[in-house]
Amino acid sequence: MLLHFSKMHGLGNDFMVVDNVTQNLYVNPDQIRRWADRHTGIGFDQMLLVEPPYDPDLDFHYRIFNADGSEVAQCGNGARCFAKFVKAKNLSNKNHLKVSTKAGKMVLHLEKDGQVTVDMGEPLFEPAAVPFKAQKAEQTYVLRVKEETVLCGVLGLGNPHCVIAVDNVDTTPVETLGAALAAHERFPESVNVGFMQKVSADEIKLRVFERGVGETRACGSGACAAAVAGIQQGLLNERVKVSLPGGDLIIRWQQGQPVKMTGPAELVYDGQMVL
């Protein structure tokens, strides 16, 4: 079988994207890990599958696999690439797409300037919904990790997210502290960890450690989670510029409303391989 795929990225968060509407690919974790290897494979943070919809009111089903082969429920940067991919491959001529994911439903909008706006849904704060082990929902929680205490916001946005405010993201030990928090017993399904530095009420700098991946150049859902946590805690305004190592995203959120994320998506190359 000859498999056609595209390599894409959203702010350096890179993906292998596969049309599973006109092709029929069954993937397993070992296969994904081999393809994700940056020395011997294609190399990517996540693999995205475009599948036919399960609901006639939707356009597609969107599946996401981390580089370690695990399937996850959400990827905001991937969602922007998903929207660009289906238009480029003539799978849809719509600029407004409704897709299902493991986490629920998403709305993707292709803007006239080439950027993509993603309706990420409403954030979840109830600990059981994240999931996170706590007696009740709080704006911040105190966690003991690596013999120190950290104050963090915790929420669900397709994936579990933990957001920590820091003085300087450039000197924060993202890999070690992120890995320790991802393995923390209070996160039964692990967690994506965001380290947020406030620049102003309208802008933050952010680095994200993604579960099953490590630190990435950008994390769309992590950017949304950081903005939401900052807004909820009264630190940020309702429109926030999030500066990640790979570039900038614009996040908008009002209490009780879905989170909106706007940013770029780029094609790197189209490829094919024999299975």
Curated annotation (Swiss-Prot):
GO terms for biological process: lysine biosynthetic process via diaminopimelate. The active site is at residues 75, 219. Pathway: Amino-acid biosynthesis; L-lysine biosynthesis via DAP pathway; DL-2,6-diaminopimelate from LL-2,6-diaminopimelate: step 1/1. It is an enzyme of class 5 (isomerase). Keywords: Amino-acid biosynthesis, Cytoplasm, Isomerase, Lysine biosynthesis. The record marks 161, 210 as: Could be important to modulate the pK values of the two catalytic cysteine residues. It is found in: Cytoplasm. Signal peptide: none annotated. The record marks 269 as: Important for dimerization. Substrate binds at residues 13, 46, 66, 76-77, 159, 192, 210-211, 220-221. InterPro entries: DAP_epimerase_AS (IPR018510), DAP_epimerase_DapF (IPR001653). It comes from the Bacteria. Its EC number is 5.1.1.7. It catalyses: (2S,6S)-2,6-diaminopimelate = meso-2,6-diaminopimelate. One of its GO terms (molecular function) is diaminopimelate epimerase activity. GO terms for cellular component: cytosol. Pfam families: DAP_epimerase. Catalyzes the stereoinversion of LL-2,6-diaminopimelate (L,L-DAP) to meso-diaminopimelate (meso-DAP), a precursor of L-lysine and an essential component of the bacterial peptidoglycan. NCBIfam families: DapF (TIGR00652). Homodimer. Belongs to the diaminopimelate epimerase family. PANTHER family: DIAMINOPIMELATE EPIMERASE, DIAMINOPIMELATE EPIMERASE, CHLOROPLASTIC. This is Diaminopimelate epimerase. It comes from Idiomarina loihiensis (strain ATCC BAA-735 / DSM 15497 / L2-TR).
